[in-house]
């Protein structure tokens, strides 16, 4: 959520910043919001004037009654004033609802460094690591490798739950678990994150706090009693501090959270339908930070590096792209995508998004910090990034480490978790 004062003060600047934002967003609602805000402020001034008049009349009535004089006229006037105040309060409440409706649907303001562009084709590559492997045999896609080795069972996953669900079996399940443990151990022991195992269901307030609702409700799995299955651990971990005031000396908070994630993938029909890249249920280790505003962009660079280092240790080629304005999404002010090389696709595929939301989520979730005990609370900056998506990492390992005989070498970093050098 944006700062209303900023919108009120610089509506044209806001509209310019949100032009070509890539969201289905009508910038004319900024003018509507400013108009509603002006109307609200006028009504509040009127209420204060009426309350002042009522207090004055109350004093006059007390004097009249004390002297035995008739106060009926003033009493009638006071009743009318009270009725008028109730009417204006009701009008203000209605305006508040309209403003809240608009505010929750305004996307974040892009950071000045975000490149112009309308789609992912205009994202800017900023660095590459490693060289894509050149095979001297006909390589296979990870879904074929997984099926042939008995690691993945897409057919029975579909039978049990439907399309885009998968059984991991035997060494496939062990590989998935090994990747999770490797991610967590690296982020906790080497990068200094605190491990979190969060709830897999959250309430509507939590989904609204991180920006999934109301805009992306169709992408969420809703269950009974107002709960939602989490699309990412970002939601419960960020909302851990909802409606709290943090201490400046405790910042930055750094959390690494493993969870299953659940997404309906509405609107993605026909995209990456085979394999592990786009599933309704998948595992992920999420990195979440809470930082002081002046430190948040340094923390974003560190977070992105932490995610990259995972792939460097696994020795899997990847690149980092800066996301352009039109592909930025709803909540981020600045976003990097880390894309891993997938031979079967012949291209780099997203395996992590690392974002700084500035105070956008903190305003929605009311997360503040205090620089010292007497200081006015300020909104924190929130950041997160995948560290990494587990299924996509497994897919990248199967494809990049495959052998001509159909077996798969185990990356050095995972051997202690799996207890094997080769999966065959």
From Swiss-Prot:
GO CC list: cytoplasm
One Pfam family this sequence matches: Seryl_tRNA_N
UniProt-annotated binding residues for ATP: 263-265, 350-353
PROSITE patterns associated with the record: AA_TRNA_LIGASE_II
GO molecular function: ATP binding; catalytic activity, acting on a protein; serine-tRNA ligase activity; transferase activity
Location relative to the cell: Cytoplasm
Biological process (GO), any one: seryl-tRNA aminoacylation
UniProtKB keywords: Aminoacyl-tRNA synthetase, ATP-binding, Cytoplasm, Ligase, Nucleotide-binding, Protein biosynthesis
Domain of life (superkingdom): Bacteria
Biochemical pathway: Aminoacyl-tRNA biosynthesis; selenocysteinyl-tRNA(Sec) biosynthesis; L-seryl-tRNA(Sec) from L-serine and tRNA(Sec): step 1/1
NCBIfam families found in the cross-reference section: serS (TIGR00414)
Subunit structure comment from the entry: Homodimer. The tRNA molecule binds across the dimer.
Role summary: Catalyzes the attachment of serine to tRNA(Ser). Is also able to aminoacylate tRNA(Sec) with serine, to form the misacylated tRNA L-seryl-tRNA(Sec), which will be further converted into selenocysteinyl-tRNA(Sec).
Domain notes: Consists of two distinct domains, a catalytic core and a N-terminal extension that is involved in tRNA binding.
Similarity comment: family membership: Belongs to the class-II aminoacyl-tRNA synthetase family. Type-1 seryl-tRNA synthetase subfamily.
Protein name from the UniProt record: Serine--tRNA ligase 1
């Amino acid at each position: 959520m944006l700062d209303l004062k900023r919108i009120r003060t610089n509506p044209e600047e806001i509209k310019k910043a949100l032009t070509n934002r890539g969201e289905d967003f009508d910038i004319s609602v900024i003018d509507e919001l400013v108009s509603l805000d002006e109307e609200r402020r006028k009504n509040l001034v009127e209420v204060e004037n009426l309350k002042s008049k009522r207090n004055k009349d109350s004093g006059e009535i007390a004097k009249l009654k004390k002297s035995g004089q008739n106060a009926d006229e003033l009493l009638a006037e006071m009743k009318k004033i009270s009725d008028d105040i109730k009417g204006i309060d009701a009008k203000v409440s209605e305006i508040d609802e309209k403003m809240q409706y608009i505010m929750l649907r305004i996307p974040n303001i892009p950071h000045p460094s975000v490149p112009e562009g309308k789609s992912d084709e205009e994202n800017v590559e900023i660095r590459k690591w490693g060289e894509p492997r050149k095979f001297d045999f006909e390589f296979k896609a990870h879904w074929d490798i997984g099926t042939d080795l008995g690691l993945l069972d897409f057919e029975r996953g579909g039978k049990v739950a439907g399309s885009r669900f998968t059984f991991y079996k035997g060494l496939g399940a062990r590989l998935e678990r090994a990747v999770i443990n490797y991610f967590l151990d690296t982020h906790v022991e080497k990068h200094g994150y605190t491990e979190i195992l969060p709830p897999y269901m959250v309430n509507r307030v939590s989904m609204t706090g991180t920006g999934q609702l109301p805009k992306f409700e169709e992408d969420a799995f809703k269950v009974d009693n107002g709960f939602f299955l989490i699309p990412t651990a970002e939601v419960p971990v960020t909302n851990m501090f909802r409606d709290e005031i943090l201490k400046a000396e405790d910042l930055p908070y750094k959390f690494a959270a493993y969870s299953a994630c659940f997404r309906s993938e509405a609107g993605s029909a026909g995209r990456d339908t085979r394999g592990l890249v786009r599933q309704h249920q998948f595992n992920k280790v999420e990195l979440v930070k809470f930082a002081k505003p002046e430190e948040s962009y340094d923390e974003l660079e560190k977070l992105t590096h932490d995610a990259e280092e995972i792939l460097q240790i696994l020795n899997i080629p990847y690149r980092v792209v800066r996301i352009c304005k039109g592909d930025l999404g709803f909540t981020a002010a600045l976003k990097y995508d880390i894309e891993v090389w997938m031979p079967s696709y012949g291209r780099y595929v997203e395996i992590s998004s690392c974002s700084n939301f500035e105070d956008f989520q903190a305003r929605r979730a009311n997360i503040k910090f205090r620089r010292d005990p007497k200081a006015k609370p300020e909104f924190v900056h929130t950041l997160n990034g995948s560290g990494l998506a587990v299924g996509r990492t497994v897919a990248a390992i199967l494809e990049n480490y495959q052998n001509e005989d159909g077996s798969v070498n185990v990356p050095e970093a995972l051997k202690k978790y799996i207890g094997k050098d080769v999966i065959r």
